[in-house]
Structures are given as C-alpha cells and as structure tokens.
C-alpha cells in the first residue's frame, strides 16, 4: 500500500503538469533549430508528392540505400528502398531479428491539399488566359485567392517522353494567381457563406494576357500562352490530357516569430512528419527489428489508388521480404508495430472555441499522440491499446523526449481520420502520432521547431530500440 501523502506532496507527485519543451532546456532549442534547417530545404524542394518522392530518393541514395529486388535475401544492417509510381517511397533497414518477429513501421504521407489542373484546363476570357483547376483535398477555397502561385508538374508527350517543370519558384520566374472581387463591388459576395466565399468554379488561375499578332486568330491570348509552353516544353494542348500538373503557393518555408521558434510553409501536412521519419530511417544502424519507413500518397483524398495506403504495395513489400527468406508473413504482421504519423491541430488561442483546452495539443509541448482519432463517436478511428501507448511513451520518457496526448478539437465540430486504420486492418497494432500545426490545410501552415525535433527523436528511438 502506498504511503499517505500530504496535499503538497500529492500535488507534486500525482498531478500532470504540461510543460513547453524548449522552456527548460537550451540544448533542445539549438538542436531543434539545426534540424529545422534541413527540413526547410526539404519543404522547398518538395512541394508536390512527385517532388517529395524524388527528394527522398536522392537522400536515400546518398545514404547508401540500394533498390529493392523482390527475390533477393538481405542481411542485417542492409538498407533498401523502392519508389511506387513516382509518388510514394518505402525504405527499410534489415534488423537482427527475423521478419517473423515483426517489423517496426513509421508511416507518413507526402501529398498535401492543393489545386490540380483539369484535363482540358486552358481557356481564354476577355483577353486573359486561364487554367481551370480542380481542388485536391480539404482546402478552404477562399484562402487561395490573391496570392502568388507556382505551377509544378509533368507532361507525357505524344511520343511517350516526359517533361517535368516548375514555374514560379525562382526569383526570376513569373508567378500566377486567382483573382478576387474588390470590396467596393463585393456586396453580393459578402452575403455568401464562408465556404462559398470563392467557389470551386471560380478557382481559375490567371496565366497570361498577351495575344499573338494575327487578327484572324480566334482566342489569340490562349494561343500565345500555348505557343510559349510549346517553345519551352515542346507540348501541345492535347498533352494536358496526359499530364499531372499542380498549383501550389509560390512562397518558401520561412522562420516565424522574432525568436525564430516556428516554421511557416505550405505542405507541413504531412511533410513535417515525413521528413523526420525519413531522417530517422536513414540514421538507423543495426536495428533490433527490420524498420520500414513509408512515405505514402493520396491520404488527403482517402488513401485510394495504387500509391495510397489502401493499396497493397507496402504489405506486398513486407511479404516479399518474408518469402525470399522462407518466413511466414502472417506471423510477421502479427508481431509488427506501427507509428502512423500525421499532423494534428495545434491549440489556437485566436480560435479557442474550436478546442477543448484540457485535451488539446499545443505547439511547443512536444510530439503529440492520439490513442484514437475519428469523428463524432470515434467513427473511422483506429483505437490503440493502453499497452501500446504505454510501451511507446515509456521509451520516450526513458530518453527525455517531450510528448503530449490529446484529441483534435471540441467534440462534434468535425473530426479527422488517419491512415492508421489501413495498417490495423492487416492485424498490425498502430498508434497515431504527429506534430501539432496552426492553420492546418491552409497555404501557409505553422509548426514549432521543438515539436518537429521531438518527432524525429521519437521515430529514431522507435526504429533503433523498439522491441
């Protein structure tokens, strides 16, 4: 039986006192700031899922990873990877224990909310040329007007050759924009609901206004724009039907605050988890269990398709490793553990009514865990066991990693799910984890550098030591 405590002793020993991780330790600030520099460079190089996959592959090759060969057997310590359809990456370090004794997975996604061009996007109206767009993921449409935009993508030309491009990122590049009404003529627009402030059919990107010098040509501005694209990239209008082209904010990742304690950027969701997961995988040496880092695609629209987590590509990779080694993949799945890494909402004092402060997650308090996610009555949640939460948090406590646990926001205001359930459906225990984000799904999201660094430390400890 525990000894009886005084009220003061009880307050000291029994109550949970949340702390801001960087307030107590100067070394954390320095290490977090240094780690954030690499992250900002990654963000600037990886504004689309294709670019994120390419940037990740470059880092893996520089670290000595070799391409996965399905029928080959691998020895402990070897590092392998593959890229799924140019848009998702799987990397692994072979562990000392057999595959049947389980994998250790960290899964994040590298797609972000954005605007995609439609199959036939180019048109002219009143001596302007435009691209029609189709929004991807849960954007708030009104946030995308009147700011500089860049256009990234790839054309597959009629001859089968590919051409990749990005316009709007270099200081000497032109940029693009979606126009909005002036307030002097905005009376009718002001009566719209916020969600309809700018409607989907009004998300048209302004791309030109010069015409070809030929009075007989109809749609002379459209043709002039197309001629410029043809001269630069060798494409025709028909090539847009064989293209994947995305419109993203043109700004770079920047430090936020006089103290530079935060990072503002497009694409924190979910590259703020993907980058530290990748770096932890790269730096893992001689792990106990085989580690698998997955940077997946299509999370923002339900994880469907051949590059999403509802596809089998990750699980086929694990099965192929097992089969080449003559081991049982069912046993391997049953003994595996996964961290599903996706962002969560940081408590925002300016919008406090959307949150429940006792169960919110806060920027600067460390990486956030979620025993469950989902909407309303935990709909579509993957609910981790108390034992799994205990195993992971004990590892972090033993190594001085700052962590917090909570929920997305006030009940019944909305909610959100993650890719955890698609891993859990394979019989693999999963715990949700992520970095808190201010202004999530906006063109300029904000994170705290300390939380980014604590996510990296969590993934590194899990990959190296989790047993």
Where do the language-model regions lie?
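N-terminal hydrophobic/helix-forming segments and targeting peptides
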Residues: 1-467
